[in-house]
């Protein structure tokens, strides 16, 4: 059965180095984007996931993926990062830690 509500889950592994997956469930078809921020509020990357159909995106083959790099391709520093997940009718956020 399709998910009854859109849900964002904790990224894994957490802490991570250098890559991380962000699992979620979608209650309806939607374009998805994920912005990744430093604790100071600086956006380091936007993941434009694109249009996704209703479903569960939990394991590594389906969850959103971040390679731990900035928009310009540089590896981010160790520390805490926040992710903001957006669909047409849902916004969720989470915290993840990169340890090198």
Model-identified regions with their sequence ranges:
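C-terminal tail/sorting-segment detector
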Residues: 23, 74-100
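Residue-level signal for short segments within beta-strands and strand-turn junctions
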Residues: 36-40, 70, 98-100
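Aromatic side chains
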Residues: 12, 16, 24, 37, ...
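Beta-strand secondary-structure signal
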Residues: 9, 21-23, 33, 63-65, ...
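Glycine-centered coil/turn sites that cap beta-strands in beta-rich domains
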Residues: 1-12, 16-40, 46-49
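Glycine-centered tight-turn motifs at strand-turn-strand junctions
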Residues: 28-31, 43-76, 87-92
